Amino acid sequence: MFTSKSNSVSPSPSLEQADADALDISTKVQLYGVLWKRPFGRSSAKWSRRFFIIKESFLLYYSESERKSFETNKYFNIHPKGVIPLGGCLVEAREEPSMPYAMKISHQDFHGNVLLAAESEFEQTQWLEMLQESGKVTWKNAQLGEAMIKSLEAQGLQLAKEKQEYLDKLMEETEELCLQREQREELERLNQVLEAEKQQFEEVVQELRVEQEQIKRELELTARCLKGVEQEKKELRHLTESLQHTLEELSIEKKKTLEMLEEDKNQPQPLTNQSEQPPASDGLHSNLRQIEERMQELLAEKLLAEKRMKENEERSRALEEEREFYSSQSQALQNSLQELTAEKQQAERELKAEVKVRMDLERRLREAEAALRSLEQGLNSKVRNKEKEERMRADVSHLKRFFEECIRNAELEAKMPVIMKNSVYIHKAATRRIKSCRFHRRRSSTSWNDMKPSQSFMTSQLEANNIEELKEVAKRLSRDQRFRESIYHIMATQPGASALPRGGK
């Protein structure tokens, strides 16, 4: 019943490429072939063969003989037997008693249905697909498509504009973030410098404390030396008094001896005693010489003691000056420690304030980034509602406030590193001042090293031996009874000795 070949139903793209290029654009069709058609408008079971062409959104049909002319001339007849508009039509497959591969075309404006039939299932599927695709092309769809294209173009322009604005803001934000990052790196570097200065400051404070302890020990040593010098002064004073008393006694004894010699010289002696007198006179003269020698020794010892007392006085004054010097240095170190402690506390307060400000800026920056991301999501979203628009306006207001605050704080942000540098320079100047003070103190203290009475007095073995020897000589002279006994014995052997008092005892 249907003797068409397999190529009787073929789309125009299946033609050779050269032939397709030679055709006019108006002759290009989507699909052509021979189908069975039942009459329109009246009920009839008769099916007839027709040559059908799908051109754009229209179905044209001719007599079967037109197929040969179309394939030969490569263009279709503009006077078909009928034209069926496919726009908005519903195309579906169905089965008829004699045609298992039938197709129904219906539309609300048609006064009936159009029934077509193919020879095979493959051909039915091919025609159904093309008829359904052609039915989508309508005037309304064309107008809607144009309106949608214009709307999409307008939205694209708006989105491109908003995207450009967003990119500009993103670039500004990126520059701001880079600036914030650079300032944070600068702050971290300054923090490292401050940590190093803080450690150096603590080392300087520790050195000052050690020096203060050393000065304290030197003050204690000076005080002990002063106490020892005072004790020696007392002992030397006592020794001098003892020597003076001994000299006075020897002077009295010398005077008495001289009186005895004078009396013995003036007293007439018997002739029988003249032979005995020269020895007695010689003994008195010998004793007198011994007394004078002893007095010379005592005078020398007294002069030595007075010299030692004078040296002790000078050493006492030097120790007193040394103690005053160490006291002033200790007070200066204490003042330096107090100043350094105050500067350290001030620097720590400034650093804490800077860290607090930096944390607040970072928090506001994170909030601005969140608002920027929310604004980006709102701009990229295709669905707009009142809630999203309110949220976008709130994000824009938040970003505006953030940038205004950035502008207001720009000058302060620029000055913050300078403030931190100044704090570092203050610590460096304080360190230099302390080192200079310590250098001058050491320089001035070196002049005292050669004349420290405490060290020389306590460590000189020769001077210590001289003091001990002086003490022993003084004690020996003040307690020398043999000399006195010899004097009293000589005086007792002389005439009139019983009348002399025992002053030595």
From Swiss-Prot:
Listed InterPro entries: PH-like_dom_sf (IPR011993), PH_domain (IPR001849)
Keyword match Thylakoid: no
Ranges where the PH domain occurs: 28-136
Annotated Polar residues bias: 267-278
Protein family per UniProt: Belongs to the PLEKHD1 family.
A Pfam family of this chain: PH
Assigned keywords, A-Z: Coiled coil, Methylation
PANTHER family (alphabetical): PLECKSTRIN HOMOLOGY DOMAIN-CONTAINING FAMILY D MEMBER 1 (PTHR14383:SF1), SWAP-70 RECOMBINASE (PTHR14383)
Record flagged with keyword Transferase: no
Coiled coil: 146-391
Protein name, UniProt field: Pleckstrin homology domain-containing family D member 1
